[in-house]
Amino acid sequence: EIQSIFIEHKGNYAYRRIHLELRNRGYLVNHKRVQGLMKVLNLQAKMRQKRKYSSHKGDVGKKAENLIQGQFEGSKTMEQCYTDVTEFAIPASTQKLYLSPVLDGFNSEIIAYNLSTSPNLEQVQTMLEQAFTEKHYENTILHSDQGWQYQHDSYHRFLESKGIQASMSRKGNSQDNGMMESFFGILKSEMFYGYEKTFKSLNQLEQAIVDYIDYYNNKRIKVKLKGLSPVQYRTKSFG
């Protein structure tokens, strides 16, 4: 069963999540026992790599204070949200692909995202409109880095029109946007790094990212969510 879970999740589950998934399936076994069996079976989860893309271009517009201050997890949905942009490059294409998501700090769910060959304002605007569909939000924070898109007047106008507070990381402090950094690290280590040459086109890569986000939201369990996926955790918390 351990080997089956490991293969099903493409080598991305280390012993802690395999232990939780076994528990979800009705198996009562100690996590150290799982760790030992994985060593015997030579099952080792993939290591994450660091990402390199940055949209920071200096002081080009309006900034915001860091309202998060390292307290990443919200106590309810849509209380603390996070956004950023990451870049994908493959040998098969001269163009790059850019992913711009919004993550809910309550359960680490990706509530909206946009994929584009250009990290422009239109991409961010489309993502915002997809994520924040209500007329008004009470006590919602959207945290980002100091990328030029997030300093732009149109970004701040949209947030103000919805009652959303803008929050920004300190310059050069990626850990200030830790939840978003963590998601990008998980995403790339589990479906991109080492697979770059397998993608024959940007369309194929785009579909793989769409499929992965669906898997991440609905199926991939997290230790901090008590062995549930983000959607399962939200559903269980609020019925």
Identify the residue ranges that each predicted region occupies.
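An active-site-proximal beta-strand-loop segment
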Residues: 70-111, 117-119
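C-terminal domain-tail junction helix/linker
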Residues: 153, 160-164, 188-239
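Active-site beta-loop-alpha junctions of metal-dependent nucleic acid enzymes
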Residues: 95, 113-135
